[in-house]
């Protein structure tokens, strides 16, 4: 399928018009009015039965004297992506004011005529329409006899002249597309080739019942108009239309806090993506390689092609991945002599900072258990994304039959990748890929991220932005490019690196969802997205509670435990392929009606624990853990059954058989060394090799240097003040980690789990460290007494006075962190209701003190790709990027705390065009400003943005 290339001037025009165009009016009154009109139309139509032409007469009767909507822009009460059953509904809603013609334009004598047409409808009648989704060539009206063009069209009069006026006056036009949707899933646009659905996706053709309808695509700008011969011979009018950024479904930016039809990057369409077929087999031999020998031959051929294309010194490395990726990724520098950082190590999968996995394993285990129940893997016997999709789609259909499906919500797709392996739509609730045990064709296609990098990417030196990434081939919209991976550190550790490390990526995709629920309220969210689709997310209080329970269980570990047979070397991450340990069920499985289903034991935490080795202290391996709670069935809550198995709740939490005191001591020591190195890197600016035995003394020296430099100017003083604050954070983190390691060594293994994980806990870090030292000195070697789990939420403490001890369960300012909750099994709706502050069933408490100290939902883990990462680490920011971010549950990472960050093409990308995505600096600024309400303003890190986009915001945080 051909790609429309826009000029810089055309992109500039699009941006200028988008900035001056009013947003859709979606207030309750407007939406209620549209719903009332549509209900009236449907009732009248049902009463008329199958009378011919009913949908042509009824709209006028319903609208009465008001008549159709005769204005430009978005019709009030209609959202992007809203679907309609027929042209009558479209007219009643004010989207397209005629049921007969494809172009709705004012009369020639009207004052509106000079501005242009109101709307156009893509029905597929004209064979000369060329539909590329975000842009298309629209054929004018006239000269048709049946389905054949028999006469020349005229540009000088009628509706065609009106569309030409749209081009001249830069007036956006509403676009409505017809589609054909099979009972099995795929969706095809009437004007294009159609979508790749579940069966025979091209053109929307295939088996099963077909349902025709129309969808409001939003506002498009007419960029060009011309006359050219039609396929039948006579001249036709052609109009180049392109989606208006932010005002059309194919180019609307989706923020994490929007549940509606415009989501976290570009919304992709099945109809547009279906035409992007897979490349020819001869072009990329790796596609045909089925065995290791064939893959190696293909790899050697690709390496020879790279050497042939870059024969000179500009080829610095033939493959930066060192053979880890299926395709070699060369490093090219044709600009200067700069080379890659010498301390950079390539990894295809996540790597864990020393001691971090062991620290967060209890929270990961709980998140895995909740996700296990939400995805109903226990019912299917394994991980099958297709089965999950079909289950959610079935629940959507049930809501639709009951008339409770949110207006404007697009039903969940049973397959999220089309036949070419391209993502058909971004999903704010995450994409579920299949596991290794799945063998059906549809399941294998549902493993795009799991397969790793498949495109011929290059790391290259740009003119002004350092290293960047490009592809030697055209990238079709929706194609998987790569993940963003690196070393996993805690949020508290990442906070220390703020301003020093520009390769940090918060795993907060789903934390935004629940923060939005808390802000909007349950009812508002339920009107935008079915609650059964929202995955479970652990709040800050629940994460802290899981750590407290683990600490309590660790203190009950026996002093001496029998030695277990251990692997000789402990790994720090799961296998590169992301495959979970343990056998996979062979053959196809009828899991929920899916074409095959996979199975492998345990969740992400379990798999990661096994892959990380079973050494004492390596973390939970899930052995002996009870199965998930009984699954619910039927109703809207059928898929929303996240909950704990009880093993993590209260005093029932057990660690025996999984970790040992010796193992925890080793993990605590490793983490303390990692935090020490991290603090040194802050004190030394960026280096991780700061001299000096005492990190606290080194930081004090750095603070003295910063204070001395602060006398030069007001600006320098402000900058140094922030540096002083960062040094304080670094000192607090290092002190808390060392105090925890000392406490574990002295005989209190529970102290390991009570270290700061989320950055807000750092405020208490120094106090905990000081209390630890005082308690240790007072007890003369006796470990400090810590509160038991029974004290949680009751204000009770033991041991070190009212302060709660060195590693107590008390948060900043002595408040209980999140009023830690009893972790009873909850449905997705109950969890969401809890997020909104509503009542929840069972003993689950309200948000409590969490809200008093910032957001209730925050990331626990952060990706740091500064020295350890993959090709995604080199992809630059752009205010108008051509890639989009999508959270993907795949491999062993299948919880909302730990998942894959996938980067997908959000439009067709020409070969050798630099790949980029929006880092979200503007969102960070907004969040920081919100966090500063009522407090002192914090120094923001400002860098110049060199992305070159038309709508560049200029400065980055």
From Swiss-Prot:
Query: What is the similarity comment for this entry?
Result: Belongs to the class V-like SAM-binding methyltransferase superfamily. Histone-lysine methyltransferase family. Suvar3-9 subfamily.
| Gene assigned in the entry | SUVH3
Q: Where is the Post-SET domain?
A: 941-957
Which SUPFAM superfamilies does the record associate with it?
PUA domain-like, SET domain
Q: Where is the YDG domain?
A: 73-243
* Presence of keyword Plastid: no
GO CC, sorted alphabetically, is: chromosome; nucleus
Cellular location of this protein? Answer: Nucleus; Chromosome
Disulfide bonds, paired cysteine numbers:
none
Offer one Pfam family short name for this entry: SET
Native organism: Chlamydomonas reinhardtii (Chlamydomonas smithii)
GO BP, sorted A to Z: methylation
Q: Where is the composition biased (Gly residues)?
A: 183-198, 793-805
Keyword Nucleus on entry: yes
Describe the inactivation phenotype. Answer: Loss of function mutant (T-DNA insertion) releases the transcriptional silencing of tandem transgenes.
* Official protein name in the record: Histone-lysine N-methyltransferase, H3 lysine-9 specific SUVH3
Q: Mark out the compositionally biased spans (Low complexity).
A: 560-578
User: One GO molecular function term?
Assistant: zinc ion binding
- Entry's PANTHER family? HISTONE-LYSINE N-METHYLTRANSFERASE SETMAR
The record's listing under InterPro entries reads: H3K9_HMTase_SUVAR3-9 (IPR051357), Pre-SET_dom (IPR007728), PUA-like_sf (IPR015947), SET_dom (IPR001214), SET_dom_sf (IPR046341), SRA-YDG_sf (IPR036987), SRA_YDG (IPR003105)
Recorded catalytic activity of this chain's protein: L-lysyl(9)-[histone H3] + S-adenosyl-L-methionine = N(6)-methyl-L-lysyl(9)-[histone H3] + S-adenosyl-L-homocysteine + H(+)
Q: Which residues cross the membrane?
A: none
Query: EC?
Result: 2.1.1.367
Kindly report the protein's main subcellular placement as a broad class. nucleus
Outline the extent of the Pre-SET domain.
Answer: 319-441
Among PROSITE patterns, the record links this protein to:
SET, YDG
SMART domains on file: PreSET, SET, SRA
